[in-house]
A protein has these predicted regions:
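A short glycine-enriched loop-to-beta-strand structural element that forms part of the catalytic core
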Residues: 44, 48-49, 87-103
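Catalytic core regions of nucleotide second-messenger enzymes
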Residues: 32-42, 73-94, 156-159, 163
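Catalytic-core segments of nucleotide cyclases and related cyclic-nucleotide turnover enzymes
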Residues: 57, 64, 92, 96, ...
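Residues immediately flanking
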Residues: 1, 52, 97, 139-140
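Cytosolic regulatory/linker segments at or just downstream of nucleotide-handling modules
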Residues: 100-102, 123, 129-168
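Regulatory/sensor and coupling segments of signal-transduction and defense proteins
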Residues: 1-4, 104, 162
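Catalytic NTP-binding/metal-coordinating core of nucleotidyl cyclase/transferase enzymes
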Residues: 1-69, 73, 113
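Conserved, well-folded catalytic cores of nucleic-acid-processing
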Residues: 56, 70-73, 77-80, 84, ...
């Protein structure tokens, strides 16, 4: 899962740091509630994954529920940011399911526990092509959670790094 906040243009860096820190709290809390793992903060986005180090049979469902809660729960904070700074922030979430390698990567100076693989890359592409205020999932995730949620088929989406369009 990738969840990102779209930065408005011409935002003061100090104000943006305060805004994004508040937003991160809203992005991270549902991940932990559904027992996901926060892998990293990436500027204005988070990378989280479900299924490691603790796996659940319903990890794809947990990821989707966390994504939906992120979009829902950011709304009051968006209003607060609009009132305080006059800035509209938007959140979008991308989710994909697939095989990844999970473990510690880095060097003697810095190590992080993360997930690597094409499934993570596709989640990032889902986030980058999602409409603001939405959760966009891949067809792989859709197959795993289809009877549990209502979906809108967005058709085929061109994504960076893929030779063929991806169904979203």
């Amino acid at each position: 899962m990738i969840a990102g906040v779209m930065e408005p243009p011409l935002t003061d860096p100090e104000e943006w740091a305060e805004i994004i820190n508040g937003a991160f709290a809203k992005l991270i809390e549902p991940v932990y509630r559904y027992e996901g793992t926060l892998a990293r903060l990436m500027g204005d986005a988070i990378l989280a994954f479900f299924g490691a180090p603790i796996g659940h049979e319903d990890d794809p469902q947990r990821a989707v529920r966390a994504g939906l809660e992120i979009v829902r729960d950011i709304a009051p904070y968006r209003e607060e940011v609009r009132e305080r700074w006059g800035i509209d922030i938007e959140v979008r979430v991308g989710i994909n399911s697939g095989l990844v390698v999970v473990g510690e990567v880095g060097s003697d100076l810095r190590v992080e526990y993360t997930a690597l693989g094409d499934a993570i890359n596709l989640a990032a592409r889902m986030e980058s092509t999602a409409q603001p205020g939405t959760v966009q999932i891949s067809s792989d995730t859709h197959r795993l959670v289809e009877p549990l949620f209502d979906f809108e088929d967005l058709g085929l989406t061109e994504v960076k790094g893929k030779s063929q369009p991806v169904r979203t």
